[in-house]
Amino acid sequence: MIIKEYISGISTIGVLSLSTEKFGLAPYFAEENTINKFKKVLDVPVKALNIGNSSLIGALCCANSYGIILPPFTLNREKTILSDFLKENDIDIIVKEINAKNTAFGNLILLNDKGCIISEELADFRKTFEDIFDVEVVAKNIAELPTVGSNGVATNKGALVHPDTTDEELELIKDVLKLKCIERGTASKGTPSVGACIVANSNGAVIGGDTTGPEMLKIEEGLDLID
């Protein structure tokens, strides 16, 4: 299933939220109706919270079914909310704060449950991320950009990436993340940073409300969501 949605009128929903195969996170100000749509489409429990008093959950955090990394300025009460949510839903994963120079982890990491590509800016943390996410981690910029997370979205089934991604980079992503499907594309009326506009897992995708019909079709193809 794939639907278009705004979060309080904002189309760049991937900056504000994230999803794995086990759970989703959304900003504290997200309306209950929006949260319910996320739950239905992604078929996972979803929690609304802030990280570091910020609503930029998808930009600051990164997760798969084995672990989640948080910026070092995450507040204790936010960590408690997250921990309680995971326990309530019997989700046993590693939760780790990472003290890096650039803490926009969601913008810098593209991963699923099979592999992970990180920005070259985070190369020193490759082994740390392998231990947390329990997958192979490769440091590589994509489309000559360090923001591999905001310029791509990946699930265990497929991926959509920045339109300037080269053929060689497509093959690398496909190989590292062990994917059958991958496509180049845009979202939200031509935005190349597709990860900033899409929240997805293998069950479905919620895409920014400004996304056009042709973009939606390419997203469905890349994420292997066409029935």
From Swiss-Prot:
Binds to the 50S ribosomal subunit and prevents its association with the 30S ribosomal subunit to form the 70S initiation complex. The keyword Cytoplasm does not apply. One of its GO terms (biological process) is cytosolic ribosome assembly. InterPro entries: eIF6 (IPR002769). The keyword Protein biosynthesis applies. Gene3D superfamilies: L-arginine/glycine Amidinotransferase, Chain A (3.75.10.10). This is Translation initiation factor 6. Keywords: Initiation factor, Protein biosynthesis. It comes from the Archaea. HAMAP family: eIF_6. Belongs to the eIF-6 family. One of its GO terms (molecular function) is ribosome binding.
